[in-house]
Amino acid sequence: MDAYHEFIQPTRVSQCIGCNFISPTSKSLIVGKATVLQVFEIITTETKTQQYKLKLVEQFKLHGLITDIKAIRTVENSQLDYLLVSSKGAKMSLIKWDHHLNSISTVSLHYYENSIQSSTYEKLTTTDLVVEPNNNCTCLRFKNLLTFLPFETLDEEEEDDDDDEEMNGSSGSDKKATNKENGNSNGEEVSELFESSFMIDGRTLDSRIGDIIDMQFLYNYREPTIAIIFSKAHAWAGNLPKVKDNINFIVLSLDLVTKASTTVLKIDNLPFDIDKIIPLPQPLNGSLLMGCNEIIHVDNGGITRRLALNQFTSSITTSLKNYHDQSDLNLKLENCSVKPIPNDNKVLMILNNGDFYYINFKIDGKTIKKFFVEKVSDLNYDDIQLTYPGEIATLDNNLMFISNKNGNNPLLELKYKNFEHVIVQENEENSNPLDNEDEEDDLYEEDEVNKKISINKSSIEFIKHDELLNNGPISNFTLGHYSTDKFKSSLPNPNYKEVSIISNSGSHKQGGLNILTPSVQPIIQSSLSFSQIHRMWTINNEFLITSDDENFKSEIFQLNKSFARLNSKDFINNESTIGMHELNNSEFFLQVTPKKIFVFNKKFKKIISFNKELKKYANDEIIYSTFNDEFLMVFFSSGEVVIYSINTYNESFTKINIPKILNDTIITTGYITNSSLLNAVSKDINLLINKNRGTKRKHSGKNTSITSINTPDSDLGPKSKTFILVTGDNRIVAFNRFHNERCYQLNDVDKFTDHLSLGFFEPRDTYPDPFIKNIIFNELGDEYSKDEYLTILTIGGEILVYKLFFDGENFKLVKEKDLIITGAPDNAYSLGTTIERRLVYFPNVNGFTSIFVTGITPYYISKTTHSVPRIFKFTKLPAVSFAPYSDDKIKNGLIYLDNSKNARICEIPVDFNYENNWPIKKIPIKESIKSVTYHELSNTFVISTYEEIPYDCLDEEGKPIVGVDKSKPSANSYKGYIKLISPYNWSVIDTIELVDGEIGMNVQSMVLDVGSSTKKFKNKKELIVIGTGKYRMEDLSANGSFKIFEIIDIIPEPGKPETNHKFKEIHQEDTKGAVTSICEISGRFLVSQGQKIIIRDLQDDGVVPVAFLDTSVYVSEAKSFGNLLILGDSLKSIWLAGFDAEPFRMVMLGKDLQSLDVNCADFIIKDEEIFILIADNNSTLHLVKYDPEDPTSSNGQRLIHKASFNINSTPTCIRSIPKNEEINPSSTEVFQSIGSTIDGSFYTVFPINEASYRRMYILQQQITDKEYHFCGLNPRLNRFGGLSMTVNDTNTKPLLDYEVIRMFAKLNEDRRKNLSMKVSSKNVYQDIWKDLIEFDHVLKNL
């Protein structure tokens, strides 16, 4: 019984598109990252030079793998685009933006898997989604099966009236009796958007069509027109002498009513490597046919123009007669990215290695005379690095976003160096030169075409403005220590020996290391120790104020005088301090104690006393205070609140009356802020009056959308002073400075609903039961953008965050759901609140507007422009107080106090990225990394890297083979290096160069037994073992070697303290067959060489083989646990073996009978039961068990299959680590597995007990069936739908999906109570929360 949790989200951008999704006047960027859908807007920063940044509007975790995203313009809204999101399993969701919920809304879901699967014997794999430029239809293609979805379009008269607007976009969605329609929150009929979909075979359109390679809709046709490239005779490089030019190109005009087609043109005998069609919009026409060695342009009249771009073109086609020769460019076009530049006669082409090229067209009127390829000068994109670029999205203001598979994803501006006046003129006419990428222009607008042609002579400079981080692809990772200093600034290191994940990322020049730390790594500059304090504040960067709540003492320390005490006769020293505040730009200070309030000048001389005012509250104590600008809000233990306006110029204060309706209400806490929350209702109170009277407001359609986006919140005036109060019955109340007795509340905030709307406050006759402890209503963000958020801290330690947004009429708040679980209600997690939790707001911490949370596990709440708010663990030590800190050495830092009364002055490191669930630091290596390991004794990292070199084809004797044509460019081979990296400054301090064609396949740090065979006891030594593969020509099998190195201490070079270690060779040995896997077992090491597995013993005088095993194929994975061994191969899943040292032997214990291509595997151990987690090449996890006592296991010879689970990404590496038991520690050590994927995500699979599994399984079923899921996707179908029936039969206790289960914590209170009743009639609410805490904290011991 196990559960799956993805704790690091994918970062690799697989799909992107620019469209008018939210606003009709500006394009949004829609990004797909495996299962995450993100919506960005473009913002400009206020700098010397205008800079564009991507700002995340919202992100959505989908229960399915995103395979494509397209935009479509529907009849429901002529100004905004809808999105077609296709997902794995031939599913297509039509979604739109709901401005009233600040979220996506699912219009319809179209499910074609069963229809496609019943029409073919082939297994359904990937599908392609294409959209007709005029929004007439879409097509989801699986090989030769074409599924069309016709869309309703405006009639021709309306099209003529709205020529520019109606034609800019794409179309999309289907309603059919067999198709599901989920998630239409408006409850309106959507059948008017589209007609019934239909599926046809490509051969039905034209009998000449063979196997379809690619299909696209073409521009500049009034009727839907498709271009298809197909082949009837199969060809590949090996049979080119027999079969050449087997590709055909056909253009068909479709009739969606009769489902018939008319042939427009057909071209035969194209080269075999043509595999992609690029349709060209105006001012160009036709399409580009992309091959590996050539480009062919076919215009709308069927005229072809051909370019030969390397010397291999002559080998793949029968004649070069019609080709224009540009073979001197020597281009390799495999998987290149191609994008027409809007309103230009250039097409941008980016190769796999990141080189930029133009495909230039010479146009005479409307006729293309010729085209050629031109390299873009390196100076025009010198700071832009791309490796295997993917899709390209065009945006407003000449911006382009490029998805990058093996590196970060840049946002570029295309800046025209010349003819800038022409660009301006175009902007005046067409709003943006990049705005109408999918627009059908009038074919007869010659003047406009001529204007665009004038741009073609100008050069373009590509300027990088921003980029999205990409942690992938990850192929290998290790666990190590980022911070190893036991003490920092004479105090214990709060991150001492915290286990971090170190992985590879990227490739080629964008290759590097990722360092993922489970908590923030503050840079500690200095420290202080106190005898007894509980809270502290910094004032004006000059004074540190401390409070001792037990001994009722307060003290002042001077920061610039080595923290010397400052004595002040006016300062209240004999009481504990509740709050310290700064007034008038730190010219005055305000001290609040339980009984007194004083205002001091900069010399701590009292100028204002509140003693007379506070006499009426003599029997009460002040428990909390908050201050903003001139306003002080004071909360008393009796539940009363008082607001004062302090005038330091007149040395006076004025009491601010709160709305009378609150006079008899118990107030527990509050906040003063500058906010837009009440701007709309302050201008028009009817917004709430009409709502209370039951006036129904239309939530969809043209009018609502236009209203909501044409009334920006900026038009409602600047932010105003807003007072926020929390009542004893957990309502949040808001009113302005001049409230005129108007008091508003956030409706249903006590139930923590998904959306909070404003309403009039009405007193309730309820018994106070406060569970809201603290609130902060303020901005979160970085230096580029900030948004208003309501942050709520509950008594149980839960942290809830709501984002303020404008829905077109009023301001609302929407709950952020992608947050970790920090606490629980009903005292379910009492350990989390053993030290009081408080929210502390920081307006600037190294550029971030953030919130710190005190407690036994302190937290840091932060938000970047590219992310939603994140909650990070702040070090391993508890924290009882936080305060801002700045001096000559530290700017915008902080000082915090732990529970041992030690204070640390530190900074938040800016070289970490805070966009994901853990802080991530990237270390550039600028080479592809194959393997990484951590050497604990020397605290260094060893990596295996490789680079591309020209391939030298040699035979077994090392001589060049006969028949090699040296006049043509050679293929690529690889050369490997083993590098030693010091974490001191993350530089390479030693390198082992391997021979040409040799790569370090595996690098591992092992603790091996070393000594003579005659000795009974051997020494243990940590060594580096390297397994390599030596790759030769295709007719010769690969060989390899294993090498053993010790990392020794040396005297560092002068001025380079990091160079204090180097490699020392212990042993190396060549092997027959590549070494594909290595691992340590019982003090020896295992080497998998070819189809043989040998365990060797390291002795003083060499290496001795002690046990061996033969396999049928090569081993892809080898892991050990004690004396148990996993062996995984590429065909027959895994084998479980045991190793015995007396006598030396390997015993086969059991094997898995599935036919799996094993990528990686490792052990999961609980209660002395042995489970093995297998990750195959089909993005599926399999859990098997070794249980000799089970009668179905044939005495253990058969590993029992327990569960299978789809993870939507290719798994690459798995490591076993101990599991943290937060609530109920186990008597024996429990082991879980951490895994990585190619998309940059990390997951863990961990064992749980029977009772928790039963509760969580029922809860998961209820949430799956009853709750709303984005894009209408089914979580159960996502995890188990693609598995075979045989596997599903054995899924009696499937893996739990924590992604679904954790939705429980984000539901409103009523839904949570209702679901808990479905789990059990007994009171299991607290048990469910304990399970959630247990699941969320399995990695806490790192």
Curated annotation (Swiss-Prot):
Residues 156-188 are annotated as: Disordered. GO terms for cellular component: mRNA cleavage and polyadenylation specificity factor complex. Belongs to the CFT1 family. GO terms for molecular function: RNA binding. It holds the Pfam family CPSF_A. Residues 156-167 have a biased composition (Acidic residues). PANTHER family: DNA REPAIR/RNA PROCESSING CPSF FAMILY (PTHR10644). It is found in: Nucleus. RNA-binding component of the cleavage and polyadenylation factor (CPF) complex, which plays a key role in polyadenylation-dependent pre-mRNA 3'-end formation and cooperates with cleavage factors including the CFIA complex and NAB4/CFIB. Involved in poly(A) site recognition. May be involved in coupling transcription termination and mRNA 3'-end formation. The lineage of its organism: Eukaryota, Fungi, Dikarya, Ascomycota, Saccharomycotina. Keywords: mRNA processing, Nucleus, RNA-binding. One of its GO terms (biological process) is termination of RNA polymerase II transcription. This is Protein CFT1.
